[in-house]
């Protein structure tokens, strides 16, 4: 048991899916896993372990933002021995050729968070995905007939920005989407020498203003869940 996760030793698999929304964790477990067991309810951040096509898989909610996901990723790796972490989340599209409900595989992440500035004494660190997971997810998505977008994303430290046009500078440099966790996930994976990948569904669009409901975000973005799970069983 760690400070924020109530699981006992051996209850969490080496491969884990990380949705921000704990209710999405519950949906994934109940929809896709065989014999799911809830191992965590601390602070309402639900976590489950079951099997998917014969492989032991866990799914753990992380909450929103760099500080929250950092707590769970640190404890999952350090205290429970997790080796493969796949974030399944939502993002806002920044490019015209990316549509709502498209899949995005985050190859790398920019951020305005100061967390790595502090960690690296003011220097920059480039948080990147594990190629092993990136390739597995890309191949899986293509085999399923999907057309995933692969590229950089922007990890924002705040959801509400006083400068609503700030995202346009990132878009000019080819950034695909904005979310709030990937930079932290990739940095911690590098620190501990484990594998990490973010798979995103575009839930809203900064150019077209199209958006989805909270219920849709919770229960209908199943393509990324299937890609994550089928990629996970190849590891």
Swiss-Prot record:
PROSITE patterns cross-referenced by the UniProt entry: PNP_UDP_1
UniProt KW Glycosyltransferase keyword: yes
Binding site for a purine D-ribonucleoside: 4, 179-181, 203-204
A Gene Ontology term for the protein's cellular component: cytosol
Active-site residue numbers: 204
Annotated positions binding phosphate: 20, 24, 43, 87-90
Recorded GO MF terms: purine-nucleoside phosphorylase activity
Top class in the EC scheme: transferase
Glycosyltransferase in keyword set: yes
GO biological process: purine nucleoside catabolic process
Function of the molecule: Catalyzes the reversible phosphorolytic breakdown of the N-glycosidic bond in the beta-(deoxy)ribonucleoside molecules, with the formation of the corresponding free purine bases and pentose-1-phosphate.
PANTHER family in the cross-refs: FI09636P-RELATED, URIDINE PHOSPHORYLASE
Subunit field text: Homohexamer; trimer of homodimers.
Similarity-based family: Belongs to the PNP/UDP phosphorylase family.
Protein name per the record: Purine nucleoside phosphorylase DeoD-type
UniProt source species: Clostridium perfringens (strain ATCC 13124 / DSM 756 / JCM 1290 / NCIMB 6125 / NCTC 8237 / Type A)
Organism lineage: Bacteria, Bacillati, Bacillota, Clostridia, Eubacteriales
């Amino acid at each position: 048991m760690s400070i924020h996760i109530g699981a006992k030793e051996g209850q969490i698999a080496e491969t884990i899916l990380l949705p921000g929304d704990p209710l999405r964790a519950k949906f994934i477990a109940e929809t896709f896993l065989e014999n799911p067991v809830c191992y965590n309810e601390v602070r309402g951040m639900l976590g489950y372990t079951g099997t998917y096509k014969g492989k032991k898989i866990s799914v753990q909610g992380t909450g929103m933002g760099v500080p929250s996901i950092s707590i769970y990723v640190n404890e999952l790796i350090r205290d429970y021995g997790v080796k493969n972490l796949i974030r399944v989340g939502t993002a806002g599209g920044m490019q015209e050729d990316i549509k709502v409900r498209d899949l995005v595989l985050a190859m790398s992440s920019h951020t305005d968070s100061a967390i790595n500035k502090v960690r690296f004494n003011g220097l920059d660190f480039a948080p990147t995905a594990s190629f092993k997971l990136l390739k597995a997810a890309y191949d899986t998505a293509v085999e399923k007939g999907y057309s995933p977008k692969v590229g950089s994303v922007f990890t924002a430290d705040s959801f509400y920005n006083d400068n609503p046009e700030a995202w346009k500078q990132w878009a000019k440099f080819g950034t695909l989407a904005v979310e709030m966790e990937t930079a932290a996930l990739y940095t911690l994976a590098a620190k501990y020498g484990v594998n990490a990948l973010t798979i995103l569904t575009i839930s809203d669009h900064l150019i077209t203003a199209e958006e989805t409901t909270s219920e849709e975000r919770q229960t209908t973005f199943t393509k990324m869940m299937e890609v994550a799970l089928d990629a996970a069983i190849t590891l």
